């Protein structure tokens, strides 16, 4: 819900204050991460003063938070590209090699539900590389081109 005159929005899970929304790959026909990033940029043009999230936080520095989310995803993409420079890897292997700000930070120690979210996020980040021709998808691996 957006109140243009009051510069107010209820964002649901689209923009969260303390964590990043879990952007997943649900099919290969859509680039969900690119869509999400495009939508963040669109929200930034709305010049919001207050944003209510689905996790009970109020965000008053909306543009700054959007910039943080965009930067987070850029770092993730750089991290995956750096890992893949060492050779091909499955999404599972990528997830194990990545830095995580959850629990101990070790993917292997995540509870099953958190591993599931992490893997779907890695899939979404790896899939965006298909758009920039950094990776190709083989049957079992993402490979740097």
Where are these regions (language model features)?
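Metallo-beta-lactamase
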Residues: 1-77
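C-terminal regulatory/interaction regions
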Residues: 82-145
């Amino acid at each position: 819900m957006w109140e243009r005159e009051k510069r107010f929005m209820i964002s649901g899970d689209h923009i969260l204050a303390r964590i990043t929304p879990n952007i997943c790959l649900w099919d290969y026909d859509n680039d969900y991460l690119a869509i999400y990033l495009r939508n963040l940029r669109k929200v930034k043009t709305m010049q919001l003063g207050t944003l209510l999230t689905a996790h009970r936080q109020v965000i008053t520095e909306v543009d700054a938070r959007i910039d943080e989310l965009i930067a987070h995803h850029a770092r993730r993409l750089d991290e995956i590209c750096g890992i893949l420079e060492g050779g091909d890897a499955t999404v599972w292997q990528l997830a194990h090699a990545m830095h995580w700000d959850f629990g101990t930070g070790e993917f292997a120690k995540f509870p099953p539900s958190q591993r599931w979210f992490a893997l779907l996020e890695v899939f979404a980040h790896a899939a965006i590389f298909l758009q920039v021709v950094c990776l190709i998808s083989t049957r079992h691996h993402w490979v740097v081109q």
